[in-house]
Curated annotation (Swiss-Prot):
GO biological process terms on file: positive regulation of translation
Enzyme class of the recorded protein, top EC level: hydrolase
Positions bound to GTP: 23-28, 140-143
Signal sequence extent: none
Membrane topology, from the record: Peripheral membrane protein
Claim: Secreted is one of the keywords in the record: no
Organism of origin: Streptococcus pneumoniae (strain JJA)
Encoding gene (name): lepA
Lineage, opening ranks: Bacteria, Bacillati, Bacillota, Bacilli, Lactobacillales
GO MF term list: GTP binding; GTPase activity; ribosome binding; translation elongation factor activity
Designated name of the protein: Elongation factor 4
InterPro entries the record matches: EF-4, EFG_III/V, EFG_V-like, EFTu-like_2, G_TR_CS, LepA_C_sf, LepA_CTD, LepA_IV
Location(s) in or outside the cell: Cell membrane
Protein family (similarity comment): Belongs to the TRAFAC class translation factor GTPase superfamily. Classic translation factor GTPase family. LepA subfamily.
Alphabetized PROSITE patterns for the sequence: G_TR_1, G_TR_2
Chief site of localization: membrane
Length: 607
């Protein structure tokens, strides 16, 4: 293609993504757009086509972003090239959203006509505004009996401040309004700006590992052209690779002769290790490099840490390989080896949040067949020592001796909770119980309230989300961002079994709740740990002070069964003998801790 044609083609490209809260119909809308543009034959069509992971389809959530090229012949007779970049809606996957938005010029904002705006809708809209995208609101599910599109329209204008007068009323399920949406994309989403003649600059927004071709980069070309045979260079580490193939996704990968400015597609360049390709990096040509990289989006830091251990210790290397493979297309997953006396060898992993942690654990168990034990999640604490030093600790077993600690600071998050008015009391009670500080509360409309709290992240990590859903019958929506570190009265609690510390059961707790938390755990462990041949004390200790204790009674054989009647001294002799044997067992016996015991520390609650 000559320059003229390339520029004309660039004017026909529209890059957009779809943003929405969970369950507002984003994946269904994507399905309809694929059908309408006949990208996918009706034979291949299946619900949630872009959610290719089993886990995504089962939970009905989108975890990974996907990019697809569609051709659409508009009413003006021209054929446009659409790149649809599907994004997740859940708060833990915000970084997935931010990177797919970096590859777009426009965003379709889907709002449920019955539910209105939810907390994550707002969070994603702000991300889109940060990226200067053209936002087109769409009111979906208008065929529901409870739909009230007009009040949602005013809500979009009041809460977000977008002009919703032209918002398309649609129903992705019934296929209503799909054509209008496509026409609006043509009119409203700007064509990519960028210079075909400039040196190549392409943003890596994802990478997938292919066993045969190595790492495949998903890129959005910002300037220039890339074709097979070019030598490309990654700007963050200056490594060079030879391009073997470029192409696009029409869900399936299809090879192409070139990718030009504005295109979204993939580059295969037999890159061997995932570590070479950071998502957010810039690809350029080695022969004619760009002067400076694109400003990539920010590196996401994990907020939640937990230990992952294989149940069979010989699977340690398999677990490492599995984590490396997952890290390939999940740049936010971090891990380092660690050992525990109770659990053997494993990894300390960092996650973006609880759903992320859940999904990773499930993918490890499913895709790689590794049975795991997971320790209680913890956050990063800043520990200031008496000698003026300070250290970051994410693992309770690394906490220094209490006598050396001057203060401990913990991360607080700004939690935004949207909830129907009748549940405000329940939400406030929950937030208070989780040591939250009230910030503000505004009414969105007559019925819905936006409550903002500062809550310690450690309290959210446990089971805040489940509690929030159950106390509001599932109506609350919730979004959080890290706000600051604050000093807190925190202590480390150890659990002792038969006098020995079990390092994997240690956790950090606020001093005011230490006693009840300790009591709860020892009682819970008593139910879970099977009875042994000897008596086992379970103790909860802070430093050297025991705050709670309970005993698991010994199993004992009835040694008197063989004495029919007979002298009491004979019975006493047998009982004394049994007692001495139990005592000896206790001094050398060790206690097996079942997997549920580690999880029970997690699902701690004020039952």
């Amino acid at each position: 293609m000559n320059l003229e044609e390339l520029k004309k083609r660039q004017g026909k490209i529209r890059n957009f993504s779809i943003i929405a809260h969970i369950d507002h119909g984003k994946s269904t809308l994507a399905d309809r757009i694929l059908e309408k543009t006949e990208t996918v034959s009706s034979r291949e069509m299946q619900a949630q086509l872009l959610d290719s992971m089993d886990l995504e389809r089962e939970r009905g959530i989108t975890i990974k972003l996907n990019a697809i090229e569609l051709n659409y012949t508009a009413k003006d007779g021209e054929t446009y090239i659409f790149h649809l970049i599907d994004t997740p809606g859940h708060v833990d996957f915000t970084y997935e959203v931010s990177r797919s938005l970096a590859a777009c010029e426009g965003a379709i904002l889907v709002v449920d006509a019955a539910q209105g705006i939810e907390a994550q809708t707002l969070a994603n809209v702000y991300l889109a505004l940060d990226n200067d995208l053209e936002i087109m609101p769409i009111i979906n599910k208008i065929d529901l009996p409870a739909a009230d599109p007009e009040s949602v329209r005013t809500e979009i204008e009041d809460v977000i401040g977008l002009d919703a007068s032209e918002a398309v009323l649609a129903s992705a399920k019934a296929g209503i309004g799909i054509e209008e949406i496509l026409e609006q994309i043509v009119e409203k989403v700007p064509a990519p700006t960028g210079d075909v003649t400039a040196p190549l600059k392409a943003l890596i927004f994802d990478s997938v590992y292919d066993a045969y071709r190595g790492v495949i980069l998903q890129v959005r070309v910002m300037d220039g052209v890339v074709k097979p045979g070019d030598k490309i260079q990654l700007m963050s580490n200056s490594k060079t690779f030879d391009v073997a193939e470029v192409g696009i996704f029409t869900p399936k990968a299809v090879g192409r002769d070139f990718l030009a400015t504005g295109d979204v597609g993939y580059i295969a360049a037999s890159i061997k290790t995932v570590q070479d390709t950071r998502v957010g990096d810039t690809v350029t040509l080695a022969t004619n490099p760009a002067a400076e990289p694109l400003h990539g989006y920010k590196q996401m830091n994990p907020m939640v840490f937990a230990g992952l251990y294989p149940i069979e210790s010989n699977k340690y290397n398999d677990l490492r390989e599995a984590l490396e493979k997952l890290q390939l297309n999940d740049a936010s997953l971090q891990f380092e080896p660690e050992t525990s006396q109770a659990l053997g060898f494993g990894f300390r992993c960092g996650f973006l949040g609880l759903l992320h942690m859940d999904v990773i654990q499930e993918r490890l168990e499913r895709e790689f067949n590794i049975d795991l034990i997971m320790t209680a999640p913890s956050v990063i604490y800043k520990v200031n020592l008496t000698d003026g030093e300070s250290m970051d600790v994410s693992n309770p077993s690394e906490f220094p001796d209490p006598t050396k600690i001057a203060t401990i600071e913990e991360p607080y998050v700004k939690a935004q909770i949207m909830v129907p008015q009748e549940f405000v009391g329940a939400v406030m009670e929950l937030a208070q119980r989780k040591r939250g500080d009230f910030v503000t509360m505004d009414y969105i409309d007559d019925n819905r309230v936006n409550v903002i709290y500062q809550i310690p992240l450690a309290e959210i990590v446990f089971d805040f989300f489940d509690k929030l859903k159950s106390s509001t019958r599932g109506y609350a929506s919730f979004d959080y961002e890290l706000s600051e570190y604050r000093p807190s009265k925190l202590v480390k609690m150890d659990i002792l079994l038969n006098g020995d510390k079990v390092d994997a059961l240690s956790f950090i707790v606020h001093k005011d709740f230490a006693y009840e938390r300790g009591k709860l755990i020892v009682d819970k462990l008593k139910k879970i740990i099977p009875r042994q041949q000897f008596e086992v004390p379970i103790q909860a200790a802070i430093g050297h002070k025991i705050v709670a204790r309970t005993d698991i009674k010994a199993l004992r054989k009835n040694v008197l069964a063989k004495c029919y009647g007979g002298d009491v001294s004979r019975k006493r002799k047998l009982l004394e003998k049994q007692k001495a044997g139990k005592k000896r067992m206790k001094s050398i016996g060790s206690v097996e801790v079942p997997q549920e015991a580690f999880l029970s520390v997690l699902s701690m609650d004020e039952e």
